[in-house]
């Protein structure tokens, strides 16, 4: 069931979708087992950098829950991967002085899986379900009464032998996380008392995260270098820390130093085919392919076929950042480069 306890303690060729992209916000195996990354996690909401409005709302809700001695209302966190949804779930549990159990929706395959999770909870505990939009219908429906009335309504047997059984549950808080809010059914979405979007981080917030982590791993990283790295991290702490670790590799192995300068960052990222905009080879091939269409809109499926990639991956992994930085626009007829995007890709013809 993939339940985890909450003890916080190249060349320029198109990348295939199963290859690691340093600028992909999805977590990779190395990051799951990296002890330094675990040590870098904040222990309280106050230590959590960024998301000030979200933290303020959570602080009020948590304090009100403690004051009334009631369970915190169920919380839905939505936003792009790598912004801290799992970390926030741990912090909420910590602030409530309780435990947090984690499950991922794809691992909850059968109704009995969610039943086992719910029956294993104690009074006041937090259950965090990542990718909650991927719950199957039967499992989701079991959550309705559990979230609303803290009970399970189970149907057992078949045909004439069918009988219903109600099991009371301890009062708990469900925290759901999703990157696809629109994919969550209305009945499930409406049962969350608190729904909050996790925003991208600004440069100063990412810079502080990088400086804190550099001290933890004994790197000399100055303000200017940390700010330069923050600017190409796509507003995402996970990407920022991953890039810093790769820059550290280059610094220690190639340059034999623990001091990170702006020039060293440029050389290191250039070796990984990442430019000063934070774009990699897949981004550039995507932009170049559209640019060849001479300002005529082109459909996503045609782009995917031309690049040999999955259209869903391009839509949800590649395009959002290109739109965010003003290089790409979506129209009813297809994708188009903006003037900025065309200027950028034309200038990259000889760079990589």
UniProtKB/Swiss-Prot annotation:
Annotated localization: Cytoplasm
Keyword Transcription regulation on entry: no
InterPro entries, per the entry: AAA+_ATPase, AAA_lid_4, DNA_helicase_Holl-junc_RuvB, P-loop_NTPase, RuvB-like_N, RuvB_C, WH-like_DNA-bd_sf, WH_DNA-bd_sf
Superkingdom, taxonomy of origin: Bacteria
Enzyme class: hydrolase
Annotated binding of ATP, by residue: 41, 82, 85-87, 148-150, 191, 201, 238
Gene3D superfamilies per UniProt: 1.10.8.60, P-loop containing nucleotide triphosphate hydrolases, Winged helix-like DNA-binding domain superfamily/Winged helix DNA-binding domain
GO BP: DNA recombination; DNA repair
The protein's Enzyme Commission number: 3.6.4.-
Binding positions (Mg(2+)): 86
Catalytic activity annotation: ATP + H2O = ADP + phosphate + H(+)
Chain spans, region Head domain (RuvB-H): 276-352
Family membership: Belongs to the RuvB family.
Role summary: The RuvA-RuvB-RuvC complex processes Holliday junction (HJ) DNA during genetic recombination and DNA repair, while the RuvA-RuvB complex plays an important role in the rescue of blocked DNA replication forks via replication fork reversal (RFR). RuvA specifically binds to HJ cruciform DNA, conferring on it an open structure. The RuvB hexamer acts as an ATP-dependent pump, pulling dsDNA into and through the RuvAB complex. RuvB forms 2 homohexamers on either side of HJ DNA bound by 1 or 2 RuvA tetramers; 4 subunits per hexamer contact DNA at a time.
Domain notes: Has 3 domains, the large (RuvB-L) and small ATPase (RuvB-S) domains and the C-terminal head (RuvB-H) domain. The head domain binds DNA, while the ATPase domains jointly bind ATP, ADP or are empty depending on the state of the subunit in the translocation cycle. During a single DNA translocation step the structure of each domain remains the same, but their relative positions change.
Quaternary organization: Homohexamer. Forms an RuvA(8)-RuvB(12)-Holliday junction (HJ) complex. HJ DNA is sandwiched between 2 RuvA tetramers; dsDNA enters through RuvA and exits via RuvB. An RuvB hexamer assembles on each DNA strand where it exits the tetramer. Each RuvB hexamer is contacted by two RuvA subunits (via domain III) on 2 adjacent RuvB subunits; this complex drives branch migration. In the full resolvosome a probable DNA-RuvA(4)-RuvB(12)-RuvC(2) complex forms which resolves the HJ.
Official protein name in the record: Holliday junction branch migration complex subunit RuvB
Biological classification of the source: Bacteria, Bacillati, Cyanobacteriota, Cyanophyceae, Synechococcales
Chain's gene name: ruvB
């Amino acid at each position: 069931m993939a339940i985890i306890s909450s003890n916080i303690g190249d060349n320029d060729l198109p990348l295939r979708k199963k290859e690691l992209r340093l600028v992909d916000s999805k977590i990779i195996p190395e990051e799951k087992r990296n002890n330094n990354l675990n040590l870098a996690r904040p222990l309280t909401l106050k230590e959590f950098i960024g998301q000030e409005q979200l933290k303020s709302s959570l602080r009020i809700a948590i304090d009100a829950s403690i004051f009334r001695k009631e369970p915190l209302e169920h919380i839905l966190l939505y936003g792009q991967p790598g912004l801290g949804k799992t970390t926030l779930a741990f912090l909420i549990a910590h602030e409530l002085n309780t435990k947090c159990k984690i499950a991922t929706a794809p691992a909850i395959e059968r109704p009995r899986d969610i039943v086992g999770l719910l029956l294993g909870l104690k009074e006041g505990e937090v259950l965090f379900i990542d990718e909650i939009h991927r719950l199957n219908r039967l499992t989701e429906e079991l959550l309705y009464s559990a979230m609303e009335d803290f009970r399970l309504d189970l149907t057992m047997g078949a045909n004439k032998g069918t009988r219903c059984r109600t099991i009371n549950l301890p009062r708990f808080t469900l925290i759901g996380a999703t990157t696809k809010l629109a994919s969550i059914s209305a009945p499930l979405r409406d049962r969350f008392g608190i729904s909050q979007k996790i925003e991208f981080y600004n440069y100063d917030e990412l810079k502080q995260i990088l400086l804190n982590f550099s001290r933890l791993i004994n790197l000399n990283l100055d303000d200017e270098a940390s700010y330069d790295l923050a600017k190409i991290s796509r507003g995402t702490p996970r990407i920022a820390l991953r890039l810093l670790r790769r820059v550290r590799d280059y610094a220690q192995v190639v340059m034999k130093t623990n001091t990170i300068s702006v020039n060293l960052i440029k050389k290191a990222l250039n070796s990984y085919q990442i430019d000063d905009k934070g774009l990699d080879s897949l981004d550039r091939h995507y932009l170049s392919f559209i640019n060849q269409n001479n300002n005529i809109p082109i459909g996503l499926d045609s782009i995917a076929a031309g690049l040999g990639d999955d259209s869903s991956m391009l839509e949800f992994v590649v395009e959002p950042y290109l739109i965010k930085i003003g290089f790409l626009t979506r129209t009813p007829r297809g994708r188009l480069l903006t003037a900025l995007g065309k200027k950028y890709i034309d200038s990259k013809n000889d760079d990589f």
